[in-house]
Regions:
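Proteins enriched for Cys/Gly/acidic motifs involved in redox and nucleic-acid/cofactor modification
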Residues: 1-258, 289, 319, 334, ...
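Terminal RNA-binding accessory module
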Residues: 2, 11-18, 420-545
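Conserved SAM/AdoMet-binding glycine-rich loop
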Residues: 102-103, 111, 242-388, 398-399
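Intrinsically disordered, low-complexity domain-flanking/linker segments in eukaryotic proteins
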Residues: 149-166, 266-283, 468-497
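Short flexible coil/turn linkers enriched for glycine and charged/polar residues
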Residues: 196-199, 209-211, 330, 340, ...
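Conserved, mostly hydrophobic/aromatic
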Residues: 213, 233, 250, 308, ...
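Active-site proximal loops enriched in glycine and acidic residues that flank catalytic Cys/His/Asp
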Residues: 252, 310-312, 338-340, 376-380, ...
Length: 545
């Protein structure tokens, strides 16, 4: 089970904590945050509200009066991790603190709000996305429910084992505070305690999704797309910059859809490139779009990067390409999940794009943004994916030569259109196809890394590398975070006998991309100029320029 509430110091938070009672509160909470960066922001909001209301946060499970598990339910493996974490928390409670309340939040509760109370009676409270700012009240509810179980309190006597929870003590059903279709979206005044290191942050510009992708359950869990007002986003960005944040990562379910719902008569369900271009062309000059937002962010004072994550290929415009190219503070980096390239697969996935459109879009992006690094992801083993469809994808990967790429095996998700499709692929074949695709990408990435040797990069210094970090770097793989134990070390020059710094360039998003290892000691959380001197399959080696 992940560690409970691995919190940074208070200097990392956007929230000004002045309530001394937060330290001496009789109620303490531990929080386990699972899933993506968007879910992490929800966890930050929950912790911010808890601290604001005088509830203390603990890193130690046995010290927590209430444990919150913020779950992910995007794919089967994430759902399994969420369920396992909930059940482990409930089981550990029997031996560490029978009076400990248990709250389950996030996407799992949104997806299975009707089923979970019967499936998990050991949970005290289920809360949804709309309730993240009500977390303090729900913590009180969970705590009260646990303290009202006298038979549990007595179970520590000689007649009862502390590891045995009396079924008579359980309430009839957990409290369920989950709305069917979330509408919540944070604003600049939302209490928030950042869980990222002090030098970078995630800034959520929108919530929800309007796309009809057949494999995805997100619209059902997160609701329809809803954008924040541009001035509200700018105000939050200013606050982050004032705190010393050097990299602002813009996140949402579809960042390229940003602003289209803010117009007077918003279009609903826009998906195809043609419909999107038509809607964009009719926007007034002062309308909020991702392009206008980036231009406004670029005008803010300070030395920082802006990185755009989670774009959709159907919603790119020539204006957006030109904006990224011209804004010096916007990282020359494109995160654009394509999922597949074969026409049959794109149609079955309901991606609303074609191979011809995708190829022309990538050509426009590379031509319009010199030095751009393109990250994409693909799904292999989707129902009906023949060997021919898959080979078409392999050829496309080989020809396009993405700087950054991830491959996921298709996850069967009930409640999705794809969940009822015939011609399912065996799990072993899915894994084999993923490995074949990543083998091609490994060679592409290594060739790209070799081309960077001798170049001067501006990098963000993150931390000093310890011995384990250096050892992992020698055999690190992007294949979903696994280490390549089958390979000989690729970077013998990475020695713990001398200092190395861990850094990232514009081509490296936090947690998902490569690293740059800089020889020597440099101040952390600063931008530095370095010269690339070597590489591994996925990482670069450098020295101060």
């Amino acid at each position: 089970m992940p560690d409970i509430a691995l919190l940074p110091s208070l200097r990392h938070t956007c929230l000004q904590v002045t309530n001394q009672h937060a330290i001496d509160s009789p109620i303490s909470v531990g929080l386990i945050s699972l899933g993506c960066a968007k879910n992490l922001v929800d966890s930050e909001i929950m912790i911010g509200n808890l601290i604001k209301d005088g509830i203390s946060i603990t890193n130690t499970p046995e010290e927590a009066d209430v444990v919150i598990v913020n779950t992910c339910s995007f794919i089967d493996s994430a759902q399994e991790e969420s369920v396992d974490t909930i059940l482990e928390s409930a089981e550990m409670r029997k031996v560490r603190n029978l009076g400990q309340g248990l709250i389950v939040a996030g996407c799992l509760t949104q997806r299975y709000r009707k089923e979970l109370p019967k499936l998990m009676p050991e949970v005290d409270v289920f809360m949804g996305i709309d309730q993240v700012e009500e977390v303090s009240q729900l913590v009180q509810v969970a705590r009260k429910r646990r303290l009202q179980r006298p038979s549990e309190a007595e179970s520590t006597s000689e007649e009862a084992s502390p590891s045995e929870e009396s079924p008579d003590s359980a309430p009839e059903a957990p409290v369920m505070e989950v709305t069917a279709r979330p509408v919540y979206i944070p604003d600049v005044n939302t209490a928030r305690f950042r869980l990222t290191p002090s030098h970078f942050a995630y800034l959520k510009i929108a919530e929800g999704c309007n796309h009809p992708c057949s494999f995805c359950i997100i619209p059902r869990m997160r609701g329809s797309h809803r954008s924040r007002q541009a001035e509200d986003i700018l105000a939050e960005a200013r606050a982050l910059i004032a705190e010393g944040v050097k990299e602002i990562n813009l996140i949402s379910q579809d960042s390229t859809y940003y602003g289209l719902d803010l117009r007077e008569n918003p279009h609903r369900g826009i998906a195809s490139p043609e419909k999107f271009q038509e809607a964009s062309a009719s926007l007034p000059e002062n309308a909020s779009t991702l392009s206008s937002l980036l231009r406004d962010l670029n005008q803010l004072e300070g030395d920082f990067w802006i990185r755009v994550l989670y774009t959709h290929p159907a919603h790119w415009t020539d204006e957006l390409i030109a904006t990224i190219a011209s804004c010096d503070k916007v990282a020359k980096y494109v995160d654009i999940p394509l999922q597949h390239i074969h026409p049959t697969m794109l149609e079955r996935m309901r991606r609303e794009t074609s191979r011809d459109y995708i190829e022309k879009l990538l050509e426009r992006i590379r031509k319009g943004i010199p030095g751009i690094a393109i990250r994409t992801t693909f799904i292999v083993g989707f129902p009906g994916e023949t060997e021919g469809c898959f080979r078409s994808l392999l050829d496309f990967i080989q020809d396009t030569r993405f700087e950054r790429m991830g491959v996921f095996t298709y996850s069967h998700e009930e409640g999705t259109r794809a969940g009822g499709m015939a011609n399912a692929i065996e799990d072993s074949e899915k894994a084999h196809r993923r490995d074949r695709a990543m083998a091609i990408q490994r060679d592409i990435s290594r060739a790209w890394a070799s081309e960077q040797v001798g170049k001067i990069f501006k990098v963000l210094i993150e931390a000093q590398a310890d011995e384990k970090t250096l050892e992992d770097a020698k055999v690190r793989s992007w294949e979903h975070g696994h280490l390549r134990s089958d390979l000989e070390p690729q970077a013998p020059a990475l020695s713990a006998d001398e200092p190395w710094m861990v850094a990232r360039g514009q081509a490296d998003a936090p947690d998902i991309d490569g690293r740059i290892y800089v020889r020597g000691s440099l101040p952390t959380h600063t931008f530095q100029q370095v010269r690339i001197t070597g590489h591994t399959d996925y990482d670069l080696l450098a020295e101060p320029a």
